[in-house]
């Protein structure tokens, strides 16, 4: 007897609807050429870490709540005297999401977090890197429902990079538009 494994809503939508739409739009010769999501990288830089060594761990705890996965503390690669930064000091946190957690995070990002951003007018459609990856920044991490606004002592910004298997920006833009990314017109 086979177990029915949990499948995220967006993954199901990708398999049933988005793959067909991408095939019709770009008419790929092979089914494996259809672009798909590869990974999502969330990076949180903590500029105040030089003054207080506890800040990166607090930011990492918030990032763990948002991503549902334990982040890696990033450390300074070299010393910069002007910033009072020493090599090896913790300066942020990052997490790489793949599979089920990636689709769940994407669902929360597009449907819950982005509409809660103050003065949000859409994502910049030029934020692609030329190889099918999309990068965006969020100024306040409290837009995510996992973060309790009353218990937050400081706002953190974060970078979110959505990596796809698309070979160019047009294919990646079409793929993310099918996932309901709110691109600016």
Curated annotation (Swiss-Prot):
- Tell me what this protein is called: Large ribosomal subunit protein uL5
Query: What Gene Ontology molecular-function terms does this entry list?
Result: rRNA binding; structural constituent of ribosome; tRNA binding
Q: Which SUPFAM superfamilies match?
A: RL5-like (SSF55282)
> Which keywords does the record carry?
Ribonucleoprotein, Ribosomal protein, RNA-binding, rRNA-binding, tRNA-binding
A cellular component term (GO) from this record?
A: ribonucleoprotein complex
Provide the assembly information. Part of the 50S ribosomal subunit; part of the 5S rRNA/L5/L18/L25 subcomplex. Contacts the 5S rRNA and the P site tRNA. Forms a bridge to the 30S subunit in the 70S ribosome.
Protein role: This is one of the proteins that bind and probably mediate the attachment of the 5S RNA into the large ribosomal subunit, where it forms part of the central protuberance. In the 70S ribosome it contacts protein S13 of the 30S subunit (bridge B1b), connecting the 2 subunits; this bridge is implicated in subunit movement. Contacts the P site tRNA; the 5S rRNA and some of its associated proteins might help stabilize positioning of ribosome-bound tRNAs.
Q: Which PANTHER family match?
A: 60S RIBOSOMAL PROTEIN L11-RELATED (PTHR11994)
Q: Which PROSITE patterns match?
A: RIBOSOMAL_L5
* Pfam families found in the cross-reference section: Ribosomal_L5, Ribosomal_L5_C
Please provide the Gene Ontology terms (biological process) for this protein. Answer: translation
Gene name, Swiss-Prot/TrEMBL: rplE
Q: What's the family?
A: Belongs to the universal ribosomal protein uL5 family.
């Amino acid at each position: 007897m086979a177990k029915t494994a949990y499948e995220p809503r967006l993954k199901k939508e990708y398999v049933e609807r988005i793959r067909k739409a991408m095939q019709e739009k770009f008419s790929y010769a092979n089914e494996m050429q259809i672009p798909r999501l590869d990974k999502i990288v969330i990076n949180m830089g903590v500029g105040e870490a030089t003054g207080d060594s506890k800040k990166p761990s607090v930011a990492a705890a918030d990032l763990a709540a948002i991503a549902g996965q334990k982040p890696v503390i990033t450390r300074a690669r070299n010393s910069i005297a002007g910033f009072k930064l020493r090599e090896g000091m913790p300066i942020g946190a990052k997490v790489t999401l793949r599979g089920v957690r990636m689709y769940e995070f994407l669902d929360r990002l597009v449907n819950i977090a982005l509409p809660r951003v103050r003065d949000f007018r859409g994502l910049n459609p030029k934020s692609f890197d030329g190889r099918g990856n999309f990068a965006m920044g969020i100024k306040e991490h409290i837009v995510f429902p996992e973060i309790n606004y009353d218990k937050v002592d400081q706002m953190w910004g974060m970078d979110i990079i959505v990596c796809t298997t698309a070979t160019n920006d047009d294919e990646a833009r079409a793929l993310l538009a099918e996932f309901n990314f709110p691109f600016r017109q």
